[in-house]
Amino acid sequence: MENKNTQRLINLTIICKVNENEEMLKLVSEHEGHLTNVIYGKGSCKKGALAQAFGLDDDYKKAVITTLVYEENATKIIDKLNSLYNFNKKNTGIAFGVLVEGLLF
């Protein structure tokens, strides 16, 4: 296993339904997430042509989870979100990571 000091740090963001946030937090914790924040919100998009085009549903209550994880763990988390929670399909959730180095400059 690679030394943690040489691994790249990722700012991982997960957007999910509020009723799934505890499961997501457990997953983040199992993969050494640090400085984890949860923000609850309600979307402003009304169901219409634009919403249908992007596959948005009527459930506007969301949780936005941000955490810092090593790149290897970020990949594992996203893989689990795709396999266990079908994040690779519409109306299930969104997850993405940004390299922290890119945020510094």
List each language-model region with its residue ranges.
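Positively charged, small/polar-rich N-terminal and surface patches that mediate targeting and assembly
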Residues: M1-F105
